[in-house]
Amino acid sequence: MSAEDPSLTELAATFPSGAMLLNIGVDVIEVERVKKVYERQKERFLKRVFTQEEQDYCFSKSNPFPHLAARFAAKEAVSKSFSTGIGKLFSWTSCSIYHGPRMQPLVRLDEQGKALLKSLGATEVRITLSHTKTTAVAVAALVNQ
């Protein structure tokens, strides 16, 4: 792959120059914790924390729990990047985690989340997720372009 490769040019376009990092948030969670809450609360837990799109994605996997845990961690990380935590200003479903064209995790904010983003002078939330069979981690960054 050379520096002139069109796929590199396309990738570079997703990293705009002049973007400013405003804040970050991180969260780590044990997959077993998410699984235990799900086993106790089932649909109530899913509806309270995850959008339907997130549920559909996670339950399309042979083991949905690492994927649910990663999204749980992502929501916590996003709320921490906003310096609000989960609560009145930012709810569990204020953001939805989905995949972009290169399967990169992306954040979709609801109107409440968009208003909070704008009020903080940010234009975008970027995230990264990772998980093993036992642990999930997410980092969120508020940026202004």
State where each predicted segment sits.
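Core catalytic alpha/beta fold that binds nucleotide/phospho-ligands
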Residues: 2-145
